[in-house]
């Protein structure tokens, strides 16, 4: 239960991992989802919304990690076996906006959705720029 976990986190320095795409992106998943993004699936904000609702006053930053495989996305087993020769990471830090920390559920969800959409548009453009000079499909 997210709410129970968040109660325990309030008493300790904590980092919470949340994967907004929910799964690894494939071309088929992207087509099926009718994503607005060239390189990303639509973000799912339900999990992060619960965390912000329960821990908003305790959270200060969102750290976004973008991972790009210049030689093409490996399968899990290729990655584990070391057959992935190159991986690029971009780490971005964002202050959590005050309008995302409001008590009203509707306002919070709307603000959070808009904020994440802005981050996703920047992230999508960043991936496009990173892959223009490589062979990533």
Give a label for each model feature:
Residues 1-7:
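A Trp-anchored, charged/polar loop motif used as the substrate-binding/catalytic surface
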Residues 10-103:
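A cross-family acyltransferase "interaction/gating" segment
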Residues 102-137:
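Accessory terminal regions of nucleic-acid processing enzymes
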């Amino acid at each position: 239960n997210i709410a129970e976990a968040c109660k325990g986190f309030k008493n300790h320095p904590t980092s919470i991992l949340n994967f907004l795409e929910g799964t690894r992106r494939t071309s088929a998943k992207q087509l099926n989802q009718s994503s607005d993004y060239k390189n990303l699936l639509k973000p799912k904000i339900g999990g992060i919304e619960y965390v912000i609702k329960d821990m908003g006053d305790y959270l200060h930053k969102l750290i976004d990690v973008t991972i790009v495989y210049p030689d093409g996305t490996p399968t899990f087993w290729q990655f584990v076996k070391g057959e992935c020769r190159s991986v690029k990471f971009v780490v971005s830090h964002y202050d959590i906006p005050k309008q995302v920390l409001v008590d009203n559920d509707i306002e919070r969800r709307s603000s959070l959705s808009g904020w994440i959409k802005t981050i996703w548009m920047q992230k999508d453009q960043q991936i496009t720029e990173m892959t223009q000079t490589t062979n990533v499909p």
